[in-house]
């Protein structure tokens, strides 16, 4: 896993029809497969999963299937994507791609990165300084997800461990550096 833009940018082919899939992640396969099998999952299972089955069947969606997607890298770094915005709470890739965690090339990079994927799919222009309101909004949403122990509707869940959203010191982003503990 790495923090580079992680969504799927293609269409699904279902028979002779095509459908644009919503942004999804690996966790969504749990609820999707459960829906395909007609299985009911308990509220305490697959807390971050949503079913893609309606989209795969070509059913019209009146609203996004999820509010945002949370990414968690191999080294524990977080990112959150909502619409065209992606907020990365790390100064490196968070995983195997360059710059790798701890690499000298990452030392001088900002600890918070914000990208507008509509205009910068390659994530080459960090716009966090120009959009502090987006940084604050996405940070607050991520903090809510951590506090709730889930990113989908349902009863709050306990986190297995204390969650620190940002690893290491952050200059000028107190909200993003807060520790959030599950209920």
Kindly label every feature range from the protein language model.
Residues 1-19:
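Single conserved hydrophobic/aromatic residue that forms the stacking wall/gate
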Residues 2-3, 16, 24, 47, ...:
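Short coil/turn linker and secondary-structure boundary residues
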Residues 7, 35-37, 127:
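Short alpha-helical scaffold segments that flank and stabilize functional sites
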Residues 20-113, 117, 167, 171:
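C-terminal cap/loop subdomain of S1 sulfatases and analogous C-terminal strand-loop tails that border
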Residues 29, 82, 92-95, 102-113, ...:
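Long, internal low-complexity/basic segments
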């Amino acid at each position: 896993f790495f923090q580079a833009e992680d969504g799927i940018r293609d269409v699904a082919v279902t028979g002779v029809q095509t459908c644009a899939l919503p942004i999804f992640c690996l966790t969504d396969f749990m609820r999707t497969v459960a829906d395909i099998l007609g299985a009911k999952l308990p509220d305490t299972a697959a807390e971050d999963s949503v079913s893609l089955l309606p989209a795969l069947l070509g059913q019209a969606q009146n609203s996004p299937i999820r509010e945002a997607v949370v990414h968690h890298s191999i080294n524990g770094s977080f990112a959150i994507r909502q619409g065209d915005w992606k907020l990365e709470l790390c100064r490196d890739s968070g995983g195997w791609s360059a710059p790798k965690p701890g690499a000298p090339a990452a030392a001088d990079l900002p600890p918070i990165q914000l990208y507008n994927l509509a205009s910068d799919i390659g994530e080459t222009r960090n716009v966090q300084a120009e959009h502090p309101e987006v940084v604050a909004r996405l940070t607050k949403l991520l903090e809510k997800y951590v506090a709730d122990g889930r990113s989908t509707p349902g009863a709050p869940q306990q986190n297995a461990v204390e969650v620190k959203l940002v690893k290491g010191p952050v200059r000028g982003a107190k909200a993003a550096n807060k520790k959030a503990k599950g209920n």
